[in-house]
Amino acid sequence: MTQAVLGIIGGSGIYDLPGLEGAHEEVIKSPWGEPSAPLRRGTIAGLPIVFLPRHDKGHRLSPSDINYRANIDVLKRAGVTDLISLSACGSFKEEMPPGTFVLVDQFVDRTHKRESSFFGRGCVAHVSMAHPVSPRLRIHLAAAAEAEGIAIARGGTYVCMEGPQFSTYAESMTYKTSGYSVIGMTNMPEAKLAREAEICYATVAMVTDFDCWHPDHDAVTVQDIIRVLTSNADKAKALVARLAKDFPREHEPCPIGSDRALDTALITAPEARDPELLKKLDAVAGRVLRG
């Protein structure tokens, strides 16, 4: 079996990962451009960890400016088998107040300015996104949260908006009445690209606010978010430490096939594939392209 390598993408408020033993910076070049930041490698409880701050240190990148393809590509090149996204979000549910960690199981993509696939002209592929989150990772995350006494909600739909502005009241009410659970700005196309790269993916959506739908709460502001972010970031780091301690040391096959998503996805005939695009796909799709 393959050794498990746990990737952590840190969202707003999580720009480093204390507790990494043997921590060192690693710069990996990507044919898809510059990732958000150099990777931080190390171990926690003996488990290989690769950390990437999504917005760079100091929160230099807005959600629309992040090079999601380069981020996923360098994580794949670093050997990551399982990827956890730590992401701030707003809540549409009374039962998911600020401070709650939501283990979402579905996404709705409302972004419109981002490159959302590694594939395209010269090599077309269609991966399934019916079940975008690894149920195995959600089970491990739930167990880790319970062990740390962290309030979690199991399941929910994350709607990803383009940003960087927050929602209008009409938008917020539309999302709430649609039955969505939380709203954020970063998990799409990240989850789609992780699937194309055959990396098992799960999100911990960390609630900071009620967006602007709630009659008893003011419209969300950056100041409000920062106040909750500090507490959420501390809990997230404790969650990662516990997860790493109990995580299997060998990569477990994904029950929904995330780690073999390209087996039936490629549609372009081999003789019609663009050699230049294939070079860029060496890490993401090398398993099937070389086979």
From Swiss-Prot:
This protein's record includes keyword Electron transport: no
Catalytic reaction list: S-methyl-5'-thioadenosine + phosphate = 5-(methylsulfanyl)-alpha-D-ribose 1-phosphate + adenine
Gene Ontology BP terms: L-methionine salvage from methylthioadenosine; purine ribonucleoside salvage
EC numbers: 2.4.2.28
Single GO MF descriptor: S-methyl-5-thioadenosine phosphorylase activity
Cellular component, GO, one term: cytosol
Pathway annotation from the record: Amino-acid biosynthesis; L-methionine biosynthesis via salvage pathway; S-methyl-5-thio-alpha-D-ribose 1-phosphate from S-methyl-5'-thioadenosine (phosphorylase route): step 1/1
Residues given in the record as substrate binding sites: M185, D209, F210, D211
Entry-linked Gene3D superfamilies: Nucleoside phosphorylase domain
Site (Important for substrate specificity): S167, V222
Protein residues bound to phosphate: S12, R54, H55, S87, A88, T186
Keywords, sorted A to Z: Glycosyltransferase, Purine salvage, Transferase
Family: Belongs to the PNP/MTAP phosphorylase family. MTAP subfamily.
Function description: Catalyzes the reversible phosphorylation of S-methyl-5'-thioadenosine (MTA) to adenine and 5-methylthioribose-1-phosphate. Involved in the breakdown of MTA, a major by-product of polyamine biosynthesis. Responsible for the first step in the methionine salvage pathway after MTA has been generated from S-adenosylmethionine. Has broad substrate specificity with 6-aminopurine nucleosides as preferred substrates.
Family annotation (HAMAP family): MTAP
Subunit structure: Homohexamer. Dimer of a homotrimer.
Record protein name field: S-methyl-5'-thioadenosine phosphorylase
Taxonomy of the source species: Bacteria, Pseudomonadati, Pseudomonadota, Alphaproteobacteria, Hyphomicrobiales
